[in-house]
Amino acid sequence: MRQFIKLSLLVFVLLFLSELICRFSLRLVNSIKARYKSSVFSYTACLLFLKSFQNFSNAFQKLANWVFWFENDVNELLSIFYFNFDQKSEKVDYNFFNGYKVTAQKVVEKEQLLTCKLSDYYRLFRDKTFWFELINN
């Protein structure tokens, strides 16, 4: 769990760095334009530079979306763990209600669903082709 939290923090730090790099690149482009006012070379260099940073920022944006969905799933998983902990600590109180078995069955179904989601995320982050697709698109 700590590794996934570290991963999400790393992604958001990289997003912040990419924003700083984009701001720096725009300043650099403006200075190149000011220096070579009507040169074709300056505009070509600026366009290539901006295109590469646009791809870079799009890749980080997609990665941030994946981390956002992953974080939601982790929060659901943590809520299930807390719910199970509460059930075990107050098991006597829950046994008096008829809805206890139904609630326990729903918890098991949610646990199975989130286990499948977490294994999908593990496969996704382990797959190296995902990163190339993310950067190239």
From Swiss-Prot:
A Pfam short name: DUF5426
The protein, known as: Uncharacterized protein MG074
UniProt source species: Mycoplasma genitalium (strain ATCC 33530 / DSM 19775 / NCTC 10195 / G37)
Species classification: Bacteria, Bacillati, Mycoplasmatota, Mycoplasmoidales, Mycoplasmoidaceae
